[in-house]
C-alpha cells in the first residue's frame, strides 16, 4: 500500500474518531445536572414544607423519581435543609451547581438560579390567602364533613372493593398509589390513602395542572375577555428592531396552544425537558414566560400535535394579559375557582417572577381534585351557579384535529379515551393526566368522578383507562338509573 494512501486512511480514521467523540459528547450535560439538582431541591422543599412530610418519607417516595441520581440519603448528603427559613439547597462542587428552592406563602416552593443571593428570599413572590375562612367543618362538597349514607344497592360492593385492591396492590413497586377517591352522583363512595398520607396531604399534580389552567382560561373565554381563534396577544422573543410585520408566530391562536398544536419548535420532546426547554423554568430558576415565547415557528399552526409544556404556558400567558395588575392575576385562580369549589388546600406555584407554572406546578389533595372533577360532571354548575359553560366543556372534550394520528385522545388540555379503548371503557370519559400517576377521570354516563394520586417512578406507568375499566364494573350507567 502506498504511503500516501496509508496516510489518507489514518487521516480519515482520525476524523471519524473526532466525529464519533463529538457525537457521543452530551452538550447538555451541565444543564442536566443543574436540572437534576433542581428537581431534588423542589421536590424536597415541597415535600417538607408544602406536603408536611418527613425527610425519610421524602427520600423514599418523592425522590424515588430520581432513582440512582438522587444526592445523599435521608440522614446526610450534599444538600441543606433550612427549616427556619424553609428552603432546601442541593448540589455544589463535583455534584454540579447548587440549586435552592424556597417555600413561599400561598405558592409553595419556588426554585431560584444557582447565583441567587439567599439573603434576598424575601424578594420572591407570595400570595396572601389569609382572607380565606375555614371550610373544613362544612358539609361535603364545600367542606370535609361527610355524612355516612347507605351505598346505592345497584353498586356492587365486591366489584368496588376489587377495584380498590387493584389500584393499591400493584405488581410493580414503581406504581405507588397514595390515594384513590370515587364519587358517584357527587357523593364519596370510596376513599383510601396509603400509609403516611391522609385527606389533607397535598402532593404535586404535575400535568393535571394543565386541565385546571384550561378551566381558568375557559372562564375568560366565556366572559369574552379571550377568544379561541384570536392570535395570542403578546410580544414574541427575541425582540428585534425593525422586525418585518407581522411576525409569523402571530398566526398562532389560543385554540392552537390548548390543542398542543402551536407549530413552534419543540423543546420538551424526547426527554429534552430535563436538559432544556421548560425544565429550566421548572427546576433551574429561568423565566417560564421568556422561554415559551422564544421559539421559532417550524410548522403551520394546528397541523401537528406535539406535547409541549410551553404550549400550555402560551395559553396561560394569554390569560395573564387580561389583567390590569399582578395582584388580580395572582388571586384569580383562588377567587374564581378554588375558593368557589372549596378547594382551599390547593396551591398554584409560580416562577420567581410571579408567573404561574400552570403546566405542572400545583399542589393539592385528592378531595380538592374530586371537587374539580365534580364541577365538570355537573356540566360546569356549582351550588346553583354556572362557573364554566357547557360550550367550554364541549370544547375540552372534543379531539384536537391534529390528534387524529394518536387515536383522537387529546382535547383542550384534557385527555380523551383513545379510539382503541372505546370498546373497553365508557367512551364519554375524559381525564386529566399528570406525571407519576395523577388522574381525575370524569365519566358522565355513569355519574362518576375517579381521582387517583400516585408517586410512581420508572418506566411502568399506571394506566388510567385500566383503572376506569376496573372501577366502572361496580356501577350502573346513568341511563339505567
Task: For the regions a language model picked out, list residue spans one by one.
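Bacterial N-terminal signal peptides
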Residues: 9-18
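Beta-lactamase-like hydrolase cores
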Residues: 143-185
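Active-site-proximal alpha-helical segments within enzyme catalytic domains
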Residues: 214, 311-320, 360-382, 438-454
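Active-site Gly/Thr loop motif
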Residues: 343-350, 393-449
